[in-house]
Amino acid sequence: MEVFEAIESGCVSDVIKALKGNDSDPNMVNEYGCSLLHCAVENGNTEIARILLLEGANPDLYTESTPTALHRAVILRHYDIVNLLMEFNVDPDNYENHESRTPLEYAVKLNDVKMTKTLLDYGADAEDIYRFNCPINDAAANGNLEICKLLIDAGARINSRSMGSVYTIHHAIRSGNYELVVELLSRGALPDVEDELSFSSLHHAVMEGSADMVLTLLEHGASVDVQDFCGRTPLFLAANASELDIVKVLLDFWADTSVSSGRNTPLSVCDLNSDTGIEIAKQIISTMVINTEYKYHKVINEEARRNDLEIIESNNEMKDWKDSCIEEVEKMRKTTLGSDRRSLLDLCLNCDDNAIAKCLNCISCEGFFIYRQLIEYTIERGLLRHESLDKALDVMEKAFEKNRNVKDNGLKDWSDLPLGIKYDILEKIDEEDLPYC
């Protein structure tokens, strides 16, 4: 085995001499199942690897105990040798015999961005349907945004599933990388996919404890009241885990407080021995009270709601809070605004943005505490719509500005309309269709 010893020494001339002197087979293997090329790769010697390949060494050779040279070069991060092997038309998608993984999968597992890009540039398959797992799911599980981008650009499916029907978006959420979750959603990841236990992306985000992820998923259309295999909603999990910020986000998106798991509801699992648990209970109660005024809200489980009301009545602190909520709702109902004399309660819950914009100068949070955030959000809606209408009006005015040098032919156009009618016309146009420039 003079050739193996020469390769181990790293002496190029000795390798050439050993190969020529004994008329050695360039694909010979030693007692450990390693070929000459494998040994050169293990030693990171690019020059010797090139000599062996020129002498006819098989770049795709593997044994029962040894993967291909490319596998080893990737694992050892020998970038020059990887490029060399590619020059000799090595198969970038070769599976090693005992692990059934491709070189690309190893590069992804190692979080090696440079190696991943190199393999993809040489045509490695980013989406091999015969893989037990998908490289993009490994990258997402590692929370590696850059590698995920490379794989998606190379054709990886963004809604791939791995063992347990865990989707790419689930892996990303569990990695804790918020930017990766945003990237996947912006690239078309489905927000409502479920694993084999019926845990949705929203469930995973709640279990990860990320209010930002929860908000982003909801903004991308995730179902707020989805249930897992035990009937638990994201709100139930958040209340049970005392995740106050997440509870607030879910309730802002009108999560139903009555969906139960067995006889338990989000309210019943609140930890009333902690300040956070009490605050969560108050958030749920205030939502229960205001929801009765929302014309589009339907209680999913009336029996569970009745049980919650019994819990509230049996606890003095919760009962007092419910009474305060009812009192503030009545105050909002009696506060009428604008020429149409709409109630503040109706504006906040049941009116469109145009109606809010008309009453914008009259709406105030002063004197309100429990539902102050709801009123502030209503004001924000009105401001945004008012700004959009003003911007559209300005565009229309410029577009129809009369040429003073042109003789008036008696025809009426936009410029001749009263301001009130102009606003009435623009109000009938959806936000995305307003004439912006």
UniProtKB/Swiss-Prot annotation:
Question: Which keywords label this protein?
Answer: ANK repeat, Repeat
Write the signal peptide boundaries: none
In the UniProt record, does the keyword Repeat occur? yes
Q: Which Pfam families match?
A: Ank (PF00023), Ank_2 (PF12796), PRANC (PF09372)
Q: Does the keyword Transcription apply?
A: no
Spans of ANK repeats, please give.
32-61, 65-94, 99-128, 131-160, 164-195, 197-226, 230-259
The protein's name is: Putative ankyrin repeat protein FPV014
Q: Which organism is it from?
A: Fowlpox virus (strain NVSL)
